[in-house]
Amino acid sequence: EDRNKGLITASAGNHAQGVAYAAKRYGCKATIVMPTGTPLIKVNRTKSYGADVVLYGDVYDDAYDYACKLAEENGYTFVHPFNDLDVSAGQGTIAMEIVQELPTVDYILVPVGGGGLIAGVSTLAKMLNPKIRIIGVEPAEAASMTAALQAGEVVELDSANTIADGTAVKAVGDKV
């Protein structure tokens, strides 16, 4: 039933392309809501997989709200880009690739937006090598993870202004 109605997500690029690719591979419709400032190369790459791309809002959070609205109105299955344990586990396979390519790696630096990527990477990296140090890196003007850690709970920033569009998230996920 999900396949017939289609998938929807909000993303500034990488997750968008992943969902679009998977939908094409499994023969279902994908609608991707991206912030209006998303680089054209990411928009075009997402479209190249057959997804319907909707540009909406200034930042990820605006696109997310609109994607949720469309999901509810149309019965689409929403695939969250970071606040989903299965998605985070998939993103964690990056750690496996890093360790295979660099067996003596001591540190892995991970960009932090919503927190899913660092949750997945740190989980798998630590399973493969408990001594690996994982360092999260986030923009000063979109430091939602830092704010959450300082507050001891998820908080929403007033804004998330950064050129690093994949990390421009006002609040980290509460599941990862």
Question: Residues of each region from the PLM?
Answer:
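Conserved beta-strand segments of alpha/beta enzyme cores
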Residues: 29, 52, 77-78, 133
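Helix-rich "cap/lid" substructures immediately adjacent to catalytic or cofactor-binding pockets
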Residues: 1-6
